[in-house]
Curated annotation (Swiss-Prot):
PANTHER family: 30S RIBOSOMAL PROTEIN S10 FAMILY MEMBER
InterPro entries membership: Ribosomal_uS10 (IPR001848), Ribosomal_uS10_CS (IPR018268), Ribosomal_uS10_dom (IPR027486), Ribosomal_uS10_dom_sf (IPR036838)
Function: Involved in the binding of tRNA to the ribosomes.
Subunit structure as annotated in this protein's UniProt entry: Part of the 30S ribosomal subunit.
Family classification: Belongs to the universal ribosomal protein uS10 family.
Organism lineage: Bacteria, Bacillati, Bacillota, Clostridia, Eubacteriales
Name the UniProt record assigns to this protein: Small ribosomal subunit protein uS10
Record keywords, A-Z: Ribonucleoprotein, Ribosomal protein
GO BP annotation list: translation
Keyword Ribosomal protein among UniProt keywords: yes
GO cellular component, one term: ribosome
Domain of life: Bacteria
Length: 102
């Protein structure tokens, strides 16, 4: 398994939970003997939604909301079978989206 590389992409709306999850993954991988590159911060996506404040008139009165999606990238180089097992058992918060590629 040493010739493979595991790439983990994390996404979340809250950057604090995202960083805590990334630290948990890095710590688990290092503890099982794998080399880790990251967490690398990727660009933050910012979605802006503009809506009318009034349901009827006053077109000039609008309100804007934004939603930021923070992302991190972690590469696990030279993973062992213990690393994969430990990552599968890892418990992460519900607000963090994880995408794993081998």
């Amino acid at each position: 398994m040493s010739s493979q590389k595991i790439r983990i992409r994390l996404k979340a709306f809250d950057h604090k939970t995202l960083d805590q999850s990334a630290e948990k993954i890095v710590e688990t991988a290092k503890r099982t003997g794998a080399r880790v590159s990251g967490p690398i911060p990727l660009p933050t996506e910012k979605s802006i939604y503009t809506i009318l404040r009034s349901p009827h008139v006053n077109k000039d009165s609008r309100e804007q909301f934004e939603m930021r999606t923070h992302k991190r990238l972690i590469d696990i180089l030279e993973p062992t079978s213990k690393t994969v097992d430990a990552l599968m058992r890892l418990d992460l918060p519900a607000g963090v989206d994880i995408e794993i590629k081998l």
